Swiss-Prot record:
It is found in: Cellular thylakoid membrane. It holds the Pfam family PSI_PsaF. Gene3D superfamilies: Photosystem I PsaF, reaction centre subunit III (1.10.8.110). Probably participates in efficiency of electron transfer from plastocyanin to P700 (or cytochrome c553 in algae and cyanobacteria). This plastocyanin-docking protein contributes to the specific association of plastocyanin to PSI. Belongs to the PsaF family. Keywords: Membrane, Photosynthesis, Photosystem I, Signal, Thylakoid, Transmembrane, Transmembrane helix. This is Photosystem I reaction center subunit III. The keyword Thylakoid applies.
Amino acid sequence: MRRLFALILVICLSFSFAPPAKALGADLTPCAENPAFQALAKNARNTTADPQSGQKRFERYSQALCGPEGYPHLIVDGRLDRAGDFLIPSILFLYIAGWIGWVGRAYLQAIKKDSDTEQKEIQLDLGIALPIIATGFAWPAAAVKELLSGELTAKDSEITVSPR
């Protein structure tokens, strides 16, 4: 009975799923050709002291793809022709976040040897922090080095296991 139920379940599930529909921005048009975007561009407000800032902003947006409402949309599906919209900034964000994390980790390891560790966590010791920050740009190479040498990960004997 269990096998029959499992077989029926597998058959029903395999026929009930529809393949995912991929629109890939089918309703998006270049903003420069979009009438709704052109109407928005005519009423562009300046956001800085530059009297041309609104016009310049809409000139940059005209290179993007707009929806029927006239607003630019980000294409984040991995196509390389739109890498500058999302892929490059996201990789840069991950690099900077990794730099901050790596430098923070190295600073905490460096001050662990001192007697006033808690105070140095609250008020940074710039004599220790600045050289670490300066070398933090190479954090991907340092992370690979520490991973291969075993410094980055804890040994199995150091990891506690819950008695449950």
